Amino acid sequence: MRERLAWIALSVAAAAFPGRIGRASPMEDPSAGSAVFSGPTSPHPTSIFINPAALLFSRPGFHLHIGGALRLDQIGIDRKVVDPESGELADGPSVSTTTMSPTGGIAVWRSVLQERAVFGAMLHTPVIERFIADQDALRYHVLGGTMYQGMLSAAGGFKVADWFIFGLGVSLGYSGLHLEMARDTALEAGSGPERGIASDCGGSPCGIENPLASETITVDVASGGGAEGGFLSKLGGPFEDFTSNVGATLSVAIKVKGDWWGALSYVSPPGALPGRSLELKERGTVQIEEAPRDGGEFHRGRAQVRTRMPQSVWLGLRGPVLPGWDLVTSARWLNLSRHQQFELRMYGGDLEEIGVPEWYPRYRGMRDVVQLTGGLEGQDVGRTRFGGRLRLETGATSAVNVAPMQIEGWNAAATGGVDLQLHQHWVMNLGYDLTWFLPVGVDASAFDPLDRLACVDSSYDFDECRAAREGRAIPTAAGDYSRLRHTFMLSIRYDSL
């Protein structure tokens, strides 16, 4: 009876899951593989997504897991601005802010076939990125928003032999992007006196980043044609979108020697079905607030965003080194170089009449990330067990590509956690992760407003407009960046045996 109620609870949670929710690596749930007691060799519920083979390491019987995390990012930015006449950098405004990103999941799994197989399902949020909000000094890069993906994953692990386990998982995710930003209408009209930086803004030349020439853009898109409502309500979207949101996980676990196990898994991006482009397409609406010099009126139209999500490969090794303690190590490659931009298109309504560009890419410039993790964890015996890990990760953005929307340099982390048995069948987990990002000073930024002037003033010469095509010809992202992240994790688990 308990099992039936748990499966019903999972289904109800899926139907009620909100379409917009609340980042180790960018766009990533911190509890998926990086937290204590999780990873490619751990029987954590996130193994349903990252390594189903590891589910065979869990206790026999039925399991229900409900958990969440709260991530706080402390961010400091000392901006620099560009003089349009000399091209030199000068000190600009400073920003100190905190972003808060909640995430969560619910999972069930059960051993069957005399404990030779395990099947499970999980509703979770593997992709999370909350942007800096309400900072006018950063408005031409970001004014707020969230990138998210809610996912329903199902998987099985199969013990083919006592030394070999095979795992297979399938995931259906629906993604969304809510993005607020500004567009410098004077800069994007070039150097001329009619609409460009030499035109009038309150009795003086507009120049670059003049508030009177600032147009505000709010994009709200989602896969499934931008359907609103709960998670399951989006399943009515076009079949093209359905197949573009299906991913797969393949994994193996091999006994190396004695109680030492190694694991290898591959997690595909959305669109893993044969013949798919692996490109995520989201549709929805856009709202434009005209620049004050143009009247400040509101206009609405349609929006579409295309982007490419990363794939990942996990490698893990686990085994006893001290009585009651296991050494846990892992390495992960995240193929973020696929994620170069948000390809934004805005159309419909009267957007063309008021001069809103139909194609307006936003540059991201990510690169592949390698993560190395190692630590000690207590074995799953007794009423209490502790664990701790250290983590090192290469940066997803090089210094030139760092911007307020992507402060993703090299980082190091320490994480710890504890399992507390509250009752014969109930276990509570508490965890904390502290991640320090290497401070970055950016002088030669990939984002340069002078590239926009060169593009427009050349009558849109192909070579002169490369930065504009990539979404980099906007006010500079030069400056000094710092970031410190705190992640608090809490979960409760029911074990039938």
Task: Give the ranges of each region predicted by the language model.
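Bacterial N-terminal signal peptides
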Residues: 7-16
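Outer-membrane beta-barrel porins/channels
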Residues: 21-38, 43, 103-497
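N-terminal, post-signal peptide beta-strand-biased segments of exported outer-membrane/organellar beta-barrel
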Residues: 17-125
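Positively charged n-region of N-terminal signal peptides that target proteins for export
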Residues: 1-4
